[in-house]
Amino acid sequence: MLPHMTCRHLLATAQWIADNPAWAGHPALMQVTSADIARMSSQQTPQPVIGVFEIPDHQAPVVDGRALVLALDSVQNPGNLGTIIRLADWFGISDIIASRGTADAFGPKVVQATMGALVRVRVTYVDDLAGWLDGAGVPVVGTFLDGRDLYAADDLPLSPAPIVVMGNEGSGISPEVEAVVSHRLLIPSFPPGRQTSESLNVAMATGIVVSELTRRMHSNG
């Protein structure tokens, strides 16, 4: 039913089942009442169907350099993680590699923030993010306050496609991961020299970097 997940239970009201006859007889389907749905859901106005899925045990992928990969270094806010997963889905990124310090991709707040994107994006947790990046065999891009202007760095490697690392909300990319970043970038504020916010939200920054790199890859391809 979904690319990366196995459905164990599909709990639905009689009306939902009547409106979706293709699901009739499915072994995972179980009819429940609207009151049952309300008790199980954390939403104020829940949908008439709830799916229970097995949490997948992804293995870290072999990076082939054909598409961008995201790496998250202790991104701890569930809303940020969910938004980043949704961004990845929008830009065709299939894999996110996360350190153990990153929020749980299958926590309720993250799942809600992904708006369904979690079923198409694999989130894999690794014990040693720096070691994994070092052995990936492709360029590693990260954002830093002393990095090169994202829009002026015309010599960024795009083939093979790089891994984009985003760091913790408060402390940024850790020293261990910074040591394996091959290209340091800065998202500039405009106009230059104007007093502005101290920093960008990590999910916003991810969207800016991924959008620019994707634009270049498609322009050059």
Question: What are the roles of these predicted feature ranges?
Answer:
Residues M1-S42, G221:
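N-terminal positively charged helical leader segments and presequences
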Residues Q31, D64-L70, S182-P192:
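Glycine/charged-rich beta-loop-alpha catalytic/anionic-binding loops adjacent to active sites
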